[in-house]
Regions:
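Rossmann-like dinucleotide-binding domain for NAD(H)/NADP(H)
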Residues: 97, 101, 231-328
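Glycine-rich, N-terminal phosphate-binding loop of Rossmann-like dinucleotide-binding domains
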Residues: 13, 60-62, 83, 208-210, ...
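Phosphate-binding beta-alpha-beta segment of Rossmann-like dinucleotide-binding domains, i.e.
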Residues: 97-99, 105-153, 165-168, 172, ...
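Short, Asp-centered acidic motifs that coordinate Mg2+ and/or phosphate
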Residues: 56-57, 78, 205, 233, ...
Length: 328
């Protein structure tokens, strides 16, 4: 089969230096890989690139894969997410058109859990604060209140693989752990399943792991942030829009919250100036999921899903039920 005849896989964007792992898997299976810009392009540009390349498979990291993009390639059979969340993919349109949508749910739960606990320790041990102080020429140990993690109540909002891993790590520190999940939580040693209001009212630190969808957008709004203990810490490593940013800014400015650590924002990569102005805010650029090991697994497994579908097999991690798929 000539290069021109091989089915094409289009990778919309990627948060790493190259696409060699993806290329090895895709082209090693006899398909053609075409890469878009590494930085996520606007929806219109992605739609034009899909129209141009007519891919049978799409791999996407952060770029929007809209209904128009999905409808622009009659050959399309799979949209594979290089990640867990599906909020940048028009899943309903893919389903309607008989196209698989996949993700990689297992690859980074340890890293995200590590990141969330690391952010909590940055507050309880004053790591970021004292680093800034020493670099500014100030050696003043009494400028921040430090806390013993074992004495704290930590609430986890969202209790999937990442939430469970976070709970296990917090148990290791001896903290009391509360968890809120929209599904019924089975009894689990070291974890108390409670309602969201109770969790917010009792927790000294709240860690957010819940996925973003229509029901969870602004789940932590002005009313619910007001339920939190005065001086509590809020850590978000899920999706920025789970928290109402303006309400969060107000809670920080008023002193109701003791601090916020955010790996995600509502409109990445734009950072609201009011967040930058708060000394008790820690920001990282959506990298909680990354490590050498997790990125290798992500890229390999996502690419293998595309190959599986293009070979006529069902994916291992399908996240929809494509219309008419049984007839193919």
């Amino acid at each position: 089969m000539s290069t021109a005849e091989r089915p094409t896989v289009f990778i919309t964007d990627y948060a790493w230096p190259d696409v060699e792992i993806e290329r090895a898997v895709i082209e090693g299976a006899g398909f053609k890989l075409v890469a878009g810009p590494s930085t996520p392009a606007p929806a219109a540009e992605i739609e034009a690139l899909v129209e141009q390349h007519q891919p049978a498979g799409i791999l996407t990291n952060w770029a929007p894969v809209t209904a128009k993009a999905i409808g622009s390639s009659p050959a399309l059979r799979i949209v594979g997410r290089l990640g867990v969340g599906l909020d940048n993919i028009a899943v309903d349109e893919a389903t309607r058109r008989g196209i698989w949508v996949t993700n990689v749910p297992d690859y980074c739960f340890e890293e995200v859990a590590d990141h969330s606990v690391g952010m909590l320790l940055a507050f309880t041990r004053g790591l970021v604060h004292f680093d800034r102080e020493v670099r500014a020429g100030r050696w003043e140990p009494a400028t921040a209140r430090l806390l013993r993690l074992k004495t704290l109540t930590c609430g986890i909002v969202g209790y999937g693989r990442i939430g469970r891993s976070t709970a296990q790590k917090l148990n290791g520190f001896g903290a009391r752990v509360l968890a809120y999940t929209r599904s019924s939580g089975a009894a689990e040693k070291g974890v108390e399943f409670v309602g969201l209001e109770q969790l917010l009212r009792e927790s000294d630190a709240v860690i957010v792991h819940i996925p973003l969808n229509a029901e969870t957008k602004h789940l932590l709004n002005r009313e619910r942030l007001a339920w939190m203990k005065r001086g509590a810490f809020l850590i978000n490593v899920s999706r920025g829009a789970v928290i109402d940013t303006q309400a969060l800014i107000e809670a920080l400015q008023s002193g109701r919250l003791g601090g916020a650590a955010l790996d995600v924002l509502e409109n990445e990569p734009t950072v609201p100036p009011a967040l930058l102005a708060q000394p008790n805010v820690i920001l990282t650029p959506h990298i909680a999921f990354t490590s050498d090991a997790s990125l290798r697994e992500l890229r390999q497994w996502a690419s293998e899903e595309v190959v599986r579908v293009l070979r006529g097999q069902p994916p291992k991690e399908g996240r929809n039920k494509p219309a008419g798929i049984a007839a193919r």
